[in-house]
Amino acid sequence: VTGYSQGGAVALGVTRMIEENYHQENEWSVRKLYAGAGPYDPAGTYLFSMERNEMGIPAAIPLIVMGLNDAYDLGFTLDEFFLEPLLSNYEDWVGSKEYTVGQINQLMGSTIMSELMTEDALTLDSPQADMLYEVLLWNSNVGYDLQAPAYFLHSLEDEVVPLLNSINLEEQMPDKEEKTFDFDYYGSHMEASVPFVQYVYQDL
């Protein structure tokens, strides 16, 4: 199972699902997991982005907030989380599904959290932010006891997915046997995908 960026987090999640639900019945098994620069720790990323007041992929903000709102029926309203111009244009930019993530990033016009989200959304003591944080914790794979051999790569220069995702994953992984964590200067988030793919190709 392999994936990079969001695909890396999905690859880990799929591996976990297989191990927890299908492995014992010998229906499916994972020979090896390859995951690069994934947002494995969404709650940690939320806190990190609030502290820095910046989000590498601003489009992730409405996609994550309202995606979780719909999935868990949290009752969030747009004005509890978003400022203009995102607030008035959410249905067009995001709800219509007519725009790519890159286009939504451009339309939002900023990577500064305080220019995109309300004060309550950026204050963990508020009911909205507290609930969002709890749901992000539910969706984390950090701390999962991964059984399959695995290779994780993350560039120390990654400007999109914070390195803390991979660091927290490594530090809280119960069994590190046959797990390789490759943290090095591989360039930007996009540039680091090249050595990741090269490693996967050579290892296979």
Identify what each model region corresponds to.
Residues L47, Q128, Y133-V135, V160, ...:
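C-terminal catalytic histidine-bearing segment of alpha/beta-hydrolase fold enzymes
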